[in-house]
Amino acid sequence: MPVSVGSYGQQAQPSCFDRVKMGFMMGFAVGMAAGAMFGTFSCLRIGMRGRELMGGVGKTMMQSGGTFGTFMAIGMGIRC
């Protein structure tokens, strides 16, 4: 059966900005997960409890998420 040539079924490719944005979001999610594990371990190891523990873990999650997200965004930008 011949294949139709029309534009039906073809999807537009994402723009370079969309790819960089997606790379940042994926990297941020992975960095947050890693930050939750490492932050919890390091905060419990030094004896943090309660509100101090939540603040320390949250700070570590945001830092690692932002760092890894930035590197993933740069990597996706290079691939554009």
Swiss-Prot record:
UniProt keywords (A-Z) are: Antibiotic, Antimicrobial, Membrane, Mitochondrion, Mitochondrion inner membrane, Transmembrane, Transmembrane helix
Q: Give the GO terms filed under biological process for this record.
A: cellular response to reactive oxygen species; defense response to bacterium; positive regulation of reactive oxygen species metabolic process; protein import into mitochondrial matrix; protein insertion into mitochondrial inner membrane; replicative senescence
Query: Does the keyword section mention ATP-binding?
Result: no
Record has Mitochondrion as a keyword: yes
Recorded protein name is: Reactive oxygen species modulator 1
Q: Which residues cross the membrane?
A: 22-44
Q: Sum up the protein's function in the record's words.
A: Has antibacterial activity against a variety of bacteria including S.aureus, P.aeruginosa and M.tuberculosis. Acts by inducing bacterial membrane breakage.
Coiled-coil annotation reads none
One matching Pfam family is: Romo1
Q: Which gene encodes it?
A: romo1
Q: Which GO terms describe its cellular component?
A: mitochondrion; TIM23 mitochondrial import inner membrane translocase complex
Compartment annotation: Mitochondrion inner membrane
Q: Entry's PANTHER family?
A: REACTIVE OXYGEN SPECIES MODULATOR 1
Species: Danio rerio
* UniProt similarity note: Belongs to the MGR2 family.
- How does the UniProt record describe the way this protein sits in the membrane? Single-pass membrane protein
- Region entry Sufficient for antibacterial activity: which residue ranges? 42-60
Q: Main site of residence?
A: mitochondrion
